[in-house]
Structure formats: C-alpha cells, structure tokens
Regions:
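Enzymes that bind and transform nitrogen-containing heteroaromatic metabolites
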Residues: 2-229
C-alpha cells in the first residue's frame, strides 16, 4: 500500500482492506475440522456437526439456490460475514480431496457448477492449474507461490473491499502465524470432537495482538469476535 493511499485512509476516503476469517465453526474443545478427511467426509469424521448452526439458516439455503431456512441471530450474523467480501482464499483441501499434480480439470470443487462464493477465489496449492471460471461469478485461481502471493492477488481482485480467509484450519493457522489476519469471527458450536484439526495449538492470540471484541449468543452457536488493536 502506498503512502498516498495510507494518508487517504486516515482521512476516511479509502476503505481499509481488511483480511478476515468469518463464520468459521469450531467445537467447544477448539477443533475446526474432524479427523480423517476424505471424499466421504470432506469436513472430517463428525465435522459436519460443527456447521449444524449454519446449514439450517436462510442465508445458507439462499447461497445454494434453495428456499426456506431459519431466520434469527445465527442467520443474521452469518449473512453479515459475507458483506463487503470481494475475494476469498482457500487451501487445497477446501477445494477438494485430490492430491498431487492435477491429472485433469475434471474436479471443480465440492459445490457444483455454481459455487457460493461469487467472487474470485485463490486456492493455495503446490501444483499449477489454469484458472477455472464457474457459474455465478466465481473463478478459482490456483496459486503456487505461497500465502503472501495469494493475499496480494486477492487484495488486488478485491479492489479495496475485504478478503476472507475461508480455511481450512491449516491455512488459517498459517495466515495467523504470519500476522496477516486482521479480525476473526468464530462460531463456537456446542460439540465436543475430541480429535481432528485444532485451530490454535501453539498460537498465542494475545501475542499476535488480538483482543476480544464481543460475544453473541445465537440460537445454535456462540459467536466470538476478535480483532487486532
């Protein structure tokens, strides 16, 4: 970011390009995914239980072209997590179960022809692949030169709006450790997993500059908001 843009931000004329984690589900014991993720269990064994609070909401149904769903606190907070987001970053596991070099372009994600992002999505991977344009405005870009490059590209694509780190756990941990996340919204589900991918093992949020902003009790999850500063 250049000196002039920084000065304009201080004057309130340029929006701050926040990098955030939004509506990320964790268990009471701190796991963000279950163990043994595979094609049958993309969120790990029992991982779907973390997201029960979200699956029933109106915003989730709408994102997947369905009608109905519950309204209320959980729905409103989930909907807010998508506001002003103009680019996403995902790990390869979030995109799919394929390992190693891409044999072909047949795998196009877990979400069908119209993924729920509707923005550019930058997928971290060690193996190159051409961009994949989908229905509804989503284009997957496969980034092979690291998390900072992915963030730079996402910020450029977002054009001053927010970048959301979608996960999985490993990617969020990497961005946290690198000091590149500004704020987080965690949806704490009333679930004890006991095993899986732990979100904060070995990470000190206070040392990274995070403070608790607020907590909100939803119908099926407790929403915890933290940010730097």
């Amino acid at each position: 970011m250049g000196r002039i843009e920084i000065e304009l931000q201080h004057r309130g004329r340029v929006p701050v390009r926040k990098v955030k984690v939004g509506a990320f589900s964790v268990s009471i014991d701190g796991f963000g995914a279950g163990p043994r993720q595979d094609l049958q269990n993309p969120l790990g064994v029992r991982g779907t239980e973390l997201h029960d609070w979200f699956f029933h909401t109106e915003i989730f149904k709408k994102m997947h072209g369905q009608n109905g769903g519950t309204t209320g606190i959980d729905n409103d907070i989930a909907a807010q997590s998508f506001e002003n987001v103009a680019a996403w970053i995902l790990g390869r596991n979030m995109f799919g179960p394929v390992r190693g070099p891409w044999k072909d372009d047949s795998w196009k994600g877990w979400w069908g022809d119209n993924p729920p992002y509707h923005t550019p999505v930058f997928v971290l991977t060690h193996h190159p692949r051409s961009p994949l344009a989908m229905e509804g405005g989503t284009t997957f870009h496969f980034v092979t030169d690291g998390l900072e490059s992915a963030l730079k590209q996402a910020k450029e694509a977002a054009q001053g709006k927010e970048v959301r780190i979608g996960g999985g756990v490993s990617v969020i941990r990497q961005y946290l450790i690198a000091g590149l996340i500004d704020e987080m919204h965690l949806a704490v589900s009333p679930v004890l997993l006991g095993e899986g991918e732990h979100l904060f093992t070995g990470i000190s949020l206070p040392q990274l500059g995070f403070t608790l902003v607020r907590t909100v009790a939803g119908e099926s999850a407790t929403h915890v908001f933290i940010k730097k500063g």
